[in-house]
Each structure stands twice: as structure tokens, then as C-alpha cells.
From Swiss-Prot:
Stored PANTHER family: AQUAPORIN NIP2-1, AQUAPORIN NIP3-2
Motif window: NPA 1: 154-156
Mode of membrane association: Multi-pass membrane protein
Keyword Repeat applies: yes
Ranges spanned by the short sequence motif NPA 2, renumbered to the chain: 265-267
SUPFAM superfamilies: Aquaporin-like
Protein name according to UniProt: Aquaporin NIP3-2
Gene this protein is translated from: NIP3-2
Length: 305
């Protein structure tokens, strides 16, 4: 009897378990959702609804169970090979030195030729023409050579860049040698082409020594401030480097040209001096320009911080 009761109770329990309605999810019903947190070891730490996790697990098991039925959607989250950008090899030092020689030769040849044309043709070029010639030469050379050597074309620039870590110290002497040699070569080329060569191609102060020193210091200071701001700061507009540096050369030439020749460049002064044998107060240009360059670059980093 009791066995009958037990069996009937078991049947009642079984029938009760069958008659319980399944839990249904209604759209927008957040009370029946179960959320799980993926452990930090997993690929994600997002909180996902239980039914999404369960569905993803079922989809994964189906892919492993029947690979033949795989679809592009099933492989959507799989890793695919990615083409990494190719790293360009560094430019050899010999090519950088060659670029500095060519660039300095072109710059000095252009400036000296413009000065000679102005003197031989009764001021046809004028100060504005000479300044424009120098600025345009620097602009096109920067556009052409900056990706090879940095297009310094100036020992003062190379010295300042070395002091602040933008040029390896081992590259400094080869750079300066190439720049001076390019200037000397251009000066002798001009001397051989134009007869007679007017001594006006040499930068000689037409003002007092202190004023000349100050002008060369300030103009080189401004030049290196602009170069450093555009060439070394990742936040600068790199597309304007050539135009800005060329405009700075032109501006400084208009300011200091009548007084000192607006050298801003020891190579600009040294090459013509050797070609003509005139060394009047050359120390002003060889000392003031590197000091102004280091001060200009240092000032930019000081106000940037």
C-alpha cells in the first residue's frame, strides 16, 4: 500500500515536473536576464547576457563538430594575417654627406651669382631680389633633401642639432666638412665663371663689431627657432617646413643684409673668403652664428616645456 502510495507520489511528482511551464523571455524584459562576467584571463571582460554566451558556445561547438558547414560568418572573429608596414633602412652616412655637399654648393652658388648679377647690372636684382633668391633656394633644397640628410646646409644648424640630440655626434664633422667643401667649391666656380668677381660676395660687416655680432646672433637665433619648431616637434605642420625656413631666410636677409650680409651660416662666409682671400672680421660670423643657433634651439625647447 505504501509502495503504491510511493509510486503514485512519484508519478504525481513526475507529472508536476512536466506540467511546469518553461520560462519565457519577453522582449524588453530585463528581470529574466542572467549576466555573467568573463574572467580577466579571457579575451574580454564585458558583461554579456546569458543567452548570448550560451548561443556563442553552441555556435562554437557546431563549428568544431561539423567543419564542412563552416561559413564566412563563422570565421568572422578568427585571426587573419596582417601586413605590417615595411621599415625603411637608414640612409648611409655617405649619402647624407653627399646631399649636404650638393645642397650647400647649390645654395652658395645661387646666392653669389645673384649678388654678382646685381652688381654687374647696376642693381637690377636689388636687396629684395637677393633675399628672394636665397629664400627660394633654401625652400627647394629642403623639399628635395630633407628626407636624405635633414638638409642642414649650415654648420651652425648641425652644431645645434648635435647639442640637442637630433644629430649623432659621429655625423657632425662629416656634415661640417661637406658643407664647407660645398661652399668653397661653389665660390671658386663663381670666381671662374664671372670676370671680374666683385669682392661684394664676401660677407664683411658695414657696421661696428658689436652691432654686427648682435645682428648675426639674432638672425641665426630666429632661424634655428623656426627650424626646431617645425622639424623636431611632432605636433608641428611638417608640410610647411620648407616654406617657413625659406621665408625666414628671406626675412633675415632683408633685416641684416645691408649691415652684415646676413650670413647666418659659417659656410656662407668661409667659402667666399677663401676664394677671394678676404678675411675681414671673419671671426664674427664663425662665432656669433653657432652661438645664436644653439640659443635659438634651446629657447624653443625651454618655452615648449
Amino acid at each position: 500500500m505504501e509502495g503504491g502510495k510511493m509510486s503514485s507520489m512519484g508519478m504525481d511528482a513526475a507529472s508536476a515536473s512536466v506540467t511546469v511551464p518553461p520560462m519565457q523571455m519577453q522582449a524588453g524584459d530585463q528581470s529574466n536576464r542572467i549576466a555573467i562576467i568573463i574572467s580577466p584571463r579571457a579575451g574580454s571582460s564585458k558583461i554579456l547576457p546569458f543567452e548570448l554566451v550560451n548561443g556563442a558556445a553552441n555556435a562554437g561547438s557546431q563549428r568544431h563538430a561539423d567543419p564542412a558547414e563552416s561559413t564566412p560568418e563563422a570565421h568572422h572573429h578568427l585571426w587573419h594575417p596582417v601586413d605590417l608596414p615595411k621599415i625603411k633602412p637608414p640612409v648611409p652616412l655617405v649619402k647624407k654627406v653627399g646631399a649636404e655637399f650638393f645642397g650647400t654648393f647649390t645654395l652658395i652658388f645661387t646666392v653669389l651669382s645673384t649678388i654678382i648679377m646685381d652688381e654687374q647690372h647696376k642693381g637690377v636684382e636689388s636687396l629684395l631680389g637677393i633675399a628672394t633668391s636665397a629664400g627660394l633656394a633654401v625652400t627647394v633644397l629642403v623639399l628635395s633633401l630633407i628626407h636624405i640628410s635633414g638638409c642642414h646646409l649650415n654648420p651652425a644648424v648641425s652644431i645645434a642639432m648635435t647639442v640637442f640630440g637630433h644629430l649623432p655626434p659621429a655625423h657632425l664633422l662629416p656634415y661640417i666638412a661637406a658643407q664647407i667643401l660645398g661652399s668653397i667649391t661653389a665660390s671658386f666656380a663663381v670666381k671662374g665663371m664671372y670676370h671680374p668677381v666683385n669682392p661684394g660676395i664676401v660677407t664683411v660687416p658695414k657696421v661696428g663689431t658689436v652691432e654686427a655680432f648682435f645682428l648675426e646672433f639674432v638672425t641665426t637665433f630666429v632661424l634655428l627657432f623656426i627650424i626646431t619648431a617645425l622639424a623636431t616637434d611632432p605636433n608641428a605642420v611638417k608640410e610647411l617646413i620648407a616654406v617657413a625656413v625659406g621665408a625666414t631666410i628671406m626675412m633675415n636677409a632683408l633685416v641684416a643684409g645691408p649691415s652684415t650680409g646676413a650670413s647666418m651660416n659659417p659656410a656662407r662666409t668661409l667659402g667666399p673668403a677663401i676664394a677671394t682671400g678676404r678675411y675681414t672680421q671673419i671671426w664674427v660670423y664663425l662665432v656669433a652664428t653657432p652661438l645664436g643657433a644653439v640659443a635659438g634651439e634651446g629657447f624653443y625647447f625651454a618655452i615648449k616645456l
